[in-house]
A protein has these predicted regions:
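Active-site HxH/HxHxD metal-binding segment of metal-dependent hydrolases
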Residues: 16-17, 28-31, 36-112, 192-196
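Hydrophobic residues at beta-strand termini and immediately following loops
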Residues: 11, 98, 187
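Core dinuclear metal-dependent hydrolase active-site scaffold
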Residues: 10-11, 21-22, 101-128
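Histidine-centered catalytic micro-motifs
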Residues: 55-65, 114-121, 174-180
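Structural motif
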Residues: 3, 47, 108, 165-166
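Metallo-beta-lactamase
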Residues: 121-219
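Conserved beta-strand hairpin/beta-sheet module of binuclear metal-dependent hydrolase folds
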Residues: 2-50, 125-135, 141
Length: 220
C-alpha cells in the first residue's frame, strides 16, 4: 500500500485541541473517522457520496466520543469500532468490538488493532500502513497522562515501549490532541524530542511521569 491509496484529513476542535481524522480509500471512496471529537458540520463537506462506513474509537473518554450520536444519526449504516471490554459503554446498534491483533478492512484499506492501556483501560491504537493513530496513548513530544480513574503508568510504559516504539522508526503518529510543536511526527523524531520516551526502564519511566506532573503543577 502507498500513501496515494488513501488520504487523511485532520479536523481540530472539540474539548481541548482534539483531532478527528477523516480517512478516504482512494480506490473505493469508502471513508472512516478516527474518534468523534468534533461536530459533524466540520467534516460533512468532505464526506464522499458513498458516505462514512466506519467510526473508530481510540478510547471512551468523553471528549473522544462527544459527537458520536451526531455521526450515527446522520449515517445510519455507520459501524462503530470499540475495544471489546467497552462495548456496553456506547449505545448504538451497529458496533463491532475489537481486540489486540485484529485486522479491520475499510474499502481496500487494512488497519491493525493494538490494545494500548495505560492512559485508559480501553485505549486502542490503529495502524494503517505507515501511520499510527494513537489517541491519547502518545502525543507529539510526550506520552498520554495517567491521572484519571483507570489510568496505570506501568501499563502505559508497556504499551508505549513494548508496542508502539517497537514499530519502525519512520512510522508517523497521528495523535488524538494537537499538543506538540506540530500535529504529526515520526516515532524516531518523537523519541529525540521527548524525555518521556527516553526512559532506561519501567521504574525510570514512572519517575519521569511523576516529575512531569510536578512540572505541570508549577507551570499552572
Amino acid at each position: 500500500m502507498s500513501e496515494t491509496d488513501y488520504s487523511v484529513r485532520s479536523f481540530k476542535g472539540g474539548y481541548d485541541d482534539n483531532i478527528t481524522y477523516l480517512v478516504t480509500c482512494m480506490r473505493t471512496r469508502n471513508q472512516f473517522l478516527m474518534d468523534a471529537s468534533v461536530p459533524l458540520k466540520q467534516i460533512l463537506p468532505f464526506v464522499s457520496k458513498k458516505g462514512l462506513i466506519v467510526l473508530f474509537i481510540t478510547h471512551t473518554h468523553g471528549d473522544h466520543t462527544a459527537y458520536m450520536d451526531e455521526y450515527v444519526d446522520a449515517f445510519p449504516n455507520l459501524v462503530v469500532m470499540i475495544y471489546k471490554d467497552s462495548e456496553d459503554k456506547i449505545q448504538t446498534t451497529l458496533k463491532r468490538p475489537v481486540k489486540h491483533g485484529d485486522i479491520v478492512t475499510v474499502g481496500q484499506l487494512s488497519l491493525e488493532v493494538f490494545h494500548t492501556p495505560g492512559h485508559y483501560p480501553d485505549s486502542v491504537c490503529y495502524l494503517l500502513d505507515g501511520i499510527l493513530f494513537t489517541g491519547d496513548t502518545l502525543f507529539v513530544g510526550r506520552t498520554g497522562r495517567t491521572v484519571s480513574n483507570g489510568s496505570d503508568t506501568r501499563q502505559l510504559y508497556r504499551s508505549v515501549y513494548d508496542t508502539i516504539l517497537d514499530l519502525p522508526g519512520h512510522t508517523i503518529i497521528y495523535p488524538g490532541h494537537d499538543y506538540g510543536p506540530k500535529m504529526t511526527i515520526s516515532i524516531d523524531e518523537n523519541i529525540a524530542i521527548s524525555p518521556l520516551l527516553q526512559a532506561e526502564d519501567e521504574d525510570d519511566f514512572v519517575q519521569r511521569m511523576a516529575d512531569y506532573e510536578v512540572e505541570r503543577t508549577f507551570e499552572n
